[in-house]
Amino acid sequence: MKKYLNICNIYILLWCIYYLQGIVYASGGMISQMTLVLLMLISGYYFIEVNIRYRIPSFLRVLNVFIGVMTIYGVILLLDPLPLIGLYTTHQVSKLEFIKSIYISLLPIYSMYAFTKQGILKIESIQALTLVLIISTTLSYFRAEQEALQKALEAGSMQEEFTNNTGYNFLQLFPLLFFWNKKPILQYALLAFIFTFIVMGMKRGAIMIGLVCLIWFIYRTYKSSKSNRSLIIFLTSIAIICGVAYLIDFYNNSEYFQYRIEQTLEGNSSGRDSIYGSLWQYYINQESLINVIFGNGAAHTITAIGVFAHNDWFELLICQGLLGITIYIAYYISLWQNVKRKRNNDLYYSILSMCLFIMFASSLFSMSYNSLSISIAISLGYTLSNENSTY
């Protein structure tokens, strides 16, 4: 029992408790607030410790800059006496949400890095934590379904199927499956479970990213396996047959999924093209060079066109200008450099390269830098901490 009572497991358990708000306890209440405060204190402590104690890889150095810049913008937003209100609404948007979402997304990477350096976070514990995270993500999925159904009923709609953003959280569980390489049968069972929920979520971006991750996962597990290649081929064949059968059945029995596929084939981006076009016109028509370089301030997209960008790059361009874009490009370049240094280690290379792809692709279809889950933090923290080459 004692070996499970360490700061790492307690930290991840607290994240699971936080994710379960609205399922086992009320959202936004005392429990969730106290849990988040405790998590931020622990995360902040390890952010400082990692930077003081260790010679960190290039990605974390760039991440330091990114977090620092976003903190400055977040503080300026909080100090602004004017309320944050959308262009076409009188509803106020929480100013605290901007910096809170970034801290929740990015600070856990440092904690996982420190836990690995200290020898607390090991593959055996990651395997157990993977199961816990799959369970909590599944519960979150059904909570989101119930909330969407309730809103539809309140609006007088008879709609019973919805897109579910939890599909992106399932997507971020993918890299953790590489840690199960010595248990291929269970590994592929978990793979099937995760991908099923990605499809059920009906987020087209998540499904497309998931398909690429699926191909990469199969390729890397086959290439890195020396003694179980026949089993890998067999499991892959079973997965393909079952997957195709499931997709056909799901398509035939889900009118909403058919509608989403038809939208994709017709090039319908759910209004994203209009949003991006409006944001681009807003940016190029700015007269102030300061706004072009440094942006208009945190969360400015909602005051500029009435909605958030749903795309990291346009959100940064409008809010943090060329400064934000430049740092974000460096963010991905530095992570790619760390990926290349892992080529001599099959496990680390497979995990880190998939993390890079998920993060970058998500930044194009949705939001990434403020939406990373503890799953990605575990994968990044563990592999970056186990760097076995020079920085």
Question: In which residue ranges do the predicted regions lie?
Answer:
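Membrane helix-loop boundary segments at the extracytoplasmic
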Residues: 15-28, 320, 349-389
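Alpha-helical transmembrane segments of multi-pass inner-membrane proteins
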Residues: 106-108, 118-148, 161-220
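Long extracytoplasmic/lumenal interhelical loops at the membrane interface
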Residues: 266-320, 344
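Hydrophobic transmembrane alpha-helices and their immediate junctions
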Residues: 52, 60-64, 228, 320-360, ...
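A membrane-periplasm/extracellular boundary helix in multi-pass inner-membrane enzymes
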Residues: 200, 221-263, 284-285
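Transmembrane signal-anchor hairpin modules in multi-pass inner-membrane enzymes, especially those
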Residues: 1-78, 181-185, 228, 341, ...
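Aromatic-anchored transmembrane helix interface
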Residues: 33-44, 57-114, 128-134
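Hydrophobic transmembrane alpha-helices of multi-pass, membrane-embedded glycosylation machinery
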Residues: 37-44, 192-196, 207-220, 332-335, ...
